[in-house]
């Protein structure tokens, strides 16, 4: 489930209301993860209040976007229910450099590479429309492998981000 990029700012409150209703009816045996808004955003407190308002807790994990360092993870962990599993998105140059430290947190169960925000953060050429996809994909291999290595060094799962060339059936497969 997502409260971040897939929900416009104007629709955040309505999305939370819908999720509160939906999650209150969900069977506890289901594995459910929720991506929240960045901690520094105006929307994070309401996301935290939503999550902390459940008893029993229907969420298995919380997906944390735009994590830049271990302190970001610690801040989230302190605000969420005790022991909540955290899935961290590495979406910035600083997050990439700090990925091994981020992965060391005991509540972190996975690292995911977020290529779009990462490219913007790193000033990569793919943030310019028209950059050929093979050039972009090649440029993303090194940071992606750093996320994979950081995750696996700490016994965590690593995920790649979305594949943007959805009309490329061969590449998408």
Over which residues does each language-model region extend?
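Expand to "…catalyze enediolate/carbanion chemistry for C-C bond making/breaking, isomerization
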Residues: 1-173
């Amino acid at each position: 489930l997502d409260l971040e990029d897939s929900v416009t700012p104007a629709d955040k409150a309505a999305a939370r209301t819908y999720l509160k209703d939906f999650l209150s009816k969900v069977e506890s045996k289901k594995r459910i993860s929720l991506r929240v808004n960045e901690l520094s955003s105006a929307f994070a407190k309401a996301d935290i209040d939503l999550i902390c308002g459940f008893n029993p807790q229907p969420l298995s994990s919380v997906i944390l976007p735009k994590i830049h360092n271990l302190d970001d993870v610690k801040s989230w962990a302190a605000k969420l229910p005790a022991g909540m599993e955290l899935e961290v998105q590495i979406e910035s140059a600083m997050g990439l450099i700090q990925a091994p430290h981020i992965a060391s947190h005991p509540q972190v169960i996975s690292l995911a590479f977020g290529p779009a925000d990462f490219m913007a953060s790193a000033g990569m050429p793919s943030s310019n429309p028209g950059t050929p996809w093979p050039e972009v994909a090649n440029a993303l291999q090194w940071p992606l492998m750093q996320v994979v290595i950081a995750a696996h060094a700490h016994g965590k799962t690593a995920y790649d981000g979305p594949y943007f060339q959805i009309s490329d059936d061969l590449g998408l497969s």
